């Protein structure tokens, strides 16, 4: 009886290890396929990885990001929520979740996710988290908080074009046109040909500058 139990335990351990390795292979294959623009294959591979190793926060995070990139926002939110539940201290996952929630226009939930991300020492994109937090707060009409978040983002990354543009939106909403013009000019100066740079030109026209 004891021998049978031992054999069963060994077999189970080997099966678990085999699944873990298969999941890792599927994950790495999925990342390679994603880099090569093979989105459908990458999606299949990452889904295989999460199926083989459902306890991996990293695999759910990567799958969620790919789904978000493919515009499947609700599915992305579900995967990123699962990842955050598995590893609540993973700051980048919370940031990714906030981004997905913002795409779904769930602004309150996005604010909550960004604020949790900012509290995590593991977060690698603190400037972007504050920038995105500011934008979410702007959409909620919480302009003072939005301004604080965006100015903090710029203190961390003075060339962060999106933060200048979004701060311009915030001060425009607060009826501070001269400050808004300066911010939109700065947005344009950083990179005129980007979407933010071109949008800044239109904002300046709306404020009576240029033509």
Which residue ranges define each predicted feature?
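Residue-level recognition of tetratricopeptide repeat
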Residues: 22, 56, 90, 124-126, ...
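TPR alpha-solenoid repeat register
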Residues: 59, 93, 126-129, 163, ...
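Bacterial Sec signal peptide processing site at the extreme N-terminus
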Residues: 7-25
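Canonical tetratricopeptide repeat
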Residues: 28, 62, 96, 132, ...
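Structural marker of alpha-solenoid helical repeat scaffolds
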Residues: 52, 86, 120-122, 156, ...
């Amino acid at each position: 009886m004891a021998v049978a139990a031992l054999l069963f335990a060994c077999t189970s351990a080997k099966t678990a290890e085999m699944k873990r390795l298969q999941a890792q292979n599927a994950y790495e294959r999925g990342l390679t396929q994603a880099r090569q623009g093979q989105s459908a294959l990458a999606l299949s591979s990452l889904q295989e990885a999460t199926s083989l190793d459902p306890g991996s926060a990293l695999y759910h995070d990567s799958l969620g990001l790919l789904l978000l990139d493919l515009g499947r926002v609700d599915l992305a939110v579900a995967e990123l929520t699962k990842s955050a539940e598995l590893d609540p201290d993973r700051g980048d996952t919370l940031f990714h979740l906030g981004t997905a929630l913002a795409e779904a226009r769930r602004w309150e939930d996005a604010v909550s996710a960004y604020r949790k991300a900012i509290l995590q020492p593991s977060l690698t994109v603190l400037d972007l988290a504050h920038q995105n937090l500011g934008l979410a707060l702007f959409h909620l009409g919480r302009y003072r908080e939005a301004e604080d978040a965006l100015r903090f983002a710029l203190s961390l990354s003075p060339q962060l074009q999106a933060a200048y543009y979004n701060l311009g939106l915030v001060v425009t909403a607060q009826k501070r046109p001269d400050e808004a013009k300066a911010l939109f000019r700065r947005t344009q100066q950083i990179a005129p040909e980007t979407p933010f740079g071109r949008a800044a030109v239109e904002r300046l026209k709306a404020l009576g500058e240029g033509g």
